[in-house]
Amino acid sequence: MDLNNYIASIENYPQEGITFRDISPLMADGKAYSYAVREIVQYAADKDIDMIVGPEARGFIVGCPVAYALGIGFAPVRKPGKLPREVISADYEKEYGLDTLTMHADAIKPGQRVLIVDDLLATGGTVKATIEMIEKLGGVVAGCAFLVELDGLNGRKAIEGYDTKVLMNFPG
């Protein structure tokens, strides 16, 4: 199945000069959505994964069905102030400054093998901060899976050394 046909490209959104890659059409089509989830599940199948971690919000949309299919748990990564219990945090650079991500301090047990699942790999800032938190908790990042990679934004370089699966590539 050619999943590229299920990604909408919106020019000059959210700002001038940016092309936003919208996964909504993929999610709206049951066959395409389930195909994408199955592709990530298949990637994870031989990695002995204990936990899926997904950054908000679209990482939830992709990561939760993967966790369900594998019969394992899901741990959310959120912006500050969104999780009710004790958290750890990691800062990351965005094109216009610093931002912070958090996850529950007990989300990952030492030695757990984790697959990070998100919709998009661009600069790699979000996934790099997520890796930092998982490893701080003693988890092992067994891989990273994305629906879309934006080529030319050096996201792969930010996570060099980590096994990565991407279903679609688009210009960045």
Curated annotation (Swiss-Prot):
Domain of life, per lineage: Bacteria
Pathway linked to the protein: Purine metabolism; AMP biosynthesis via salvage pathway; AMP from adenine: step 1/1
Classification via InterPro entries: Ade_phspho_trans, PRibTrfase_dom, PRTase-like, UPRTase/APRTase
CDD domains with a match to the protein in the record: PRTases_typeI
BP-aspect Gene Ontology terms: adenine salvage; AMP salvage; purine ribonucleoside salvage
GO molecular function terms noted in the UniProt entry: adenine binding; adenine phosphoribosyltransferase activity; AMP binding
Keyword Transferase: yes
Gene Ontology CC terms: cytoplasm
Keyword list, A-Z: Cytoplasm, Glycosyltransferase, Purine salvage, Transferase
Places the protein is found: Cytoplasm
Reaction(s) catalysed by this chain's protein: AMP + diphosphate = 5-phospho-alpha-D-ribose 1-diphosphate + adenine
Role summary: Catalyzes a salvage reaction resulting in the formation of AMP, that is energically less costly than de novo synthesis.
Assembly and binders: Homodimer.
Family classification: Belongs to the purine/pyrimidine phosphoribosyltransferase family.
The name this protein goes by in its record: Adenine phosphoribosyltransferase
Species of the source: Streptococcus agalactiae serotype V (strain ATCC BAA-611 / 2603 V/R)
Encoding gene (name): apt
